[in-house]
Amino acid sequence: MRKSPGLSDCLWAWILLLSTLTGRSYGQPSLQDELKDNTTVFTRILDRLLDGYDNRLRPGLGERVTEVKTDIFVTSFGPVSDHDMEYTIDVFFRQSWKDERLKFKGPMTVLRLNNLMASKIWTPDTFFHNGKKSVAHNMTMPNKLLRITEDGTLLYTMRLTVRAECPMHLEDFPMDAHACPLKFGSYAYTRAEVVYEWTREPARSVVVAEDGSRLNQYDLLGQTVDSGIVQSSTGEYVVMTTHFHLKRKIGYFVIQTYLPCIMTVILSQVSFWLNRESVPARTVFGVTTVLTMTTLSISARNSLPKVAYATAMDWFIAVCYAFVFSALIEFATVNYFTKRGYAWDGKSVVPEKPKKVKDPLIKKNNTYAPTATSYTPNLAGGDPGLATIAKSATIEPKEVKPETKPPEPKKTFNSVSKIDRLSRIAFPLLFGIFNLIYWATYLNREPQLKAPTPHQ
């Protein structure tokens, strides 16, 4: 049987087409194969980087000083505790350095890794000099980022919450300002081994988020950066410092302390306008205002640490207390002179009562009447021609009017003391002058921002 030439040609054409398609599929790798190749290359690069790597040794050991560049992004600042003299800050802390042992060549220029790789390489032993407590966030995984470029430069970022010490000078409280420092550096490496530098210019090395302030009693004015050397018994260390400048808001204290003190002083001066005879009312005014000032003084100190010096608020309360107490002493003085009679225009004279003249009286029908004496003369010889005088007569009483002096002119009682008149002017005037000097002095004073040098 003989095959037809047409069928044979068609068969050969199909075979040729299939072989061509098959060849193309083998020549172009699929997407899965391409991803598999990248993963393999990535794994080989990491294995090669860690092959013979000793993370106990710093980069450039014995050859050069390791330079660590840092910058900080503040996500949240506050709160600030005056009583404990500390503040809380939440930051993204970035460090960058170069490690020639981690150079690589491959299809990618940057290796983006997580915290697992960070534990296998050398990282700076940075700590916060004035930190009381620092927390590295671990939810849901450790908040750490590591990037390695092909030239061996590393970027290491972590999220931290730091509670740091903020030394405060409260002489100007509550018109005070503070510079809260954040100081960090290497714990074990001296400046001959590891030095720190700011990544960018000072204005951009520390950035605070626009909505990062968590302050109720302060305004965050800005931040400044600096660096220095600290000498300790184990050597000289580089210390990086950031100062956060804070200005206290006075509104809360005006409402809570200053206005009540001013109103209490004014209330104590109301007693000068009361009559000096109003002893109970003026006593209540004096005692009540003194007790009120005592209560305000105690409550104002509760929110502050127990410092050995007087603050601006202490001086204000002390002067207000002196005004209130002086008003009470003024009333005591007025009352003293009133009782002695020196506050009258003239002394009061009480007219003497006329003395009654006693006459011999006899009682007749429950009435008393003066009587005359009966005389019976005896004449010698008993001459009957002579009349015997024996007469008894009742004499009508005459009213005896006592001698009266013309009444003295009535003295007018002066109920307003000269001391009260003087106090009505002197006390408000002196208190106004004090307020003018006080507020002009403290509101225009330049705050002294001091920060102690850290010690290791």
UniProtKB/Swiss-Prot annotation:
What subcellular compartments does it reside in?
Postsynaptic cell membrane; Cell membrane; Cytoplasmic vesicle membrane
Function according to Swiss-Prot or TrEMBL: Alpha subunit of the heteropentameric ligand-gated chloride channel gated by gamma-aminobutyric acid (GABA), a major inhibitory neurotransmitter in the brain. GABA-gated chloride channels, also named GABA(A) receptors (GABAAR), consist of five subunits arranged around a central pore and contain GABA active binding site(s) located at the alpha and beta subunit interface(s). When activated by GABA, GABAARs selectively allow the flow of chloride anions across the cell membrane down their electrochemical gradient. Alpha-1/GABRA1-containing GABAARs are largely synaptic.
Signal sequence segment: 1-27
Q: List residues binding 4-aminobutanoate.
A: 94, 157
Task: Note how its activity is modulated.
Answer: Allosterically activated by benzodiazepines, the neuroanesthetic alphaxalone and pentobarbital. Inhibited by the antagonist bicuculline. Potentiated by histamine.
Q: Does the keyword Transit peptide apply?
A: no
Q: Does the keyword Ribosomal protein apply?
A: no
Q: Where are the transmembrane segments?
A: 254-274, 280-301, 312-333, 422-441
Disulphide bonds in the chain: 166-180
**Protein name in the entry:** Gamma-aminobutyric acid receptor subunit alpha-1
Q: Which InterPro entries would you find in this protein's record?
A: GABAA/Glycine_rcpt, GABAAa_rcpt, GABBAa1_rcpt, Gabra-1-6_TM, GABRA1_ECD, Neur_chan_lig-bd, Neur_chan_lig-bd_sf, Neur_channel
Its main subcellular localisation, reduced to a broad class, is: membrane
Q: Which residues lie on this side of the membrane: Extracellular?
A: 28-253, 302-311, 442-456
List of glycosylated residues: 38, 138
Can you state the subunit structure given in the record? Heteropentamer, formed by a combination of alpha (GABRA1-6), beta (GABRB1-3), gamma (GABRG1-3), delta (GABRD), epsilon (GABRE), rho (GABRR1-3), pi (GABRP) and theta (GABRQ) subunits, each subunit exhibiting distinct physiological and pharmacological properties. Interacts with UBQLN1. Interacts with TRAK1. Interacts with KIF21B. Identified in a complex of 720 kDa composed of LHFPL4, NLGN2, GABRA1, GABRB2, GABRG2 and GABRB3. Interacts with LHFPL4. Interacts with NLGN2.
**Catalytic activity, per the record?**
chloride(in) = chloride(out)
Give GO terms: molecular function aspect only: GABA-A receptor activity; GABA-gated chloride ion channel activity
Q: Which Pfam families match?
A: Neur_chan_LBD, Neur_chan_memb
Membrane-topology descriptor: Multi-pass membrane protein
Q: What is the lineage of its organism?
A: Eukaryota, Metazoa, Chordata, Craniata, Vertebrata
Mind listing the UniProt keywords for this protein, alphabetically?
Cell membrane, Chloride, Chloride channel, Cytoplasmic vesicle, Disulfide bond, Glycoprotein, Ion channel, Ion transport, Ligand-gated ion channel, Membrane, Postsynaptic cell membrane, Receptor, Signal, Synapse, Transmembrane, Transmembrane helix, Transport
Q: Domain comment text?
A: The extracellular domain contributes to synaptic contact formation.
Q: Name one GO biological process term.
A: inhibitory synapse assembly
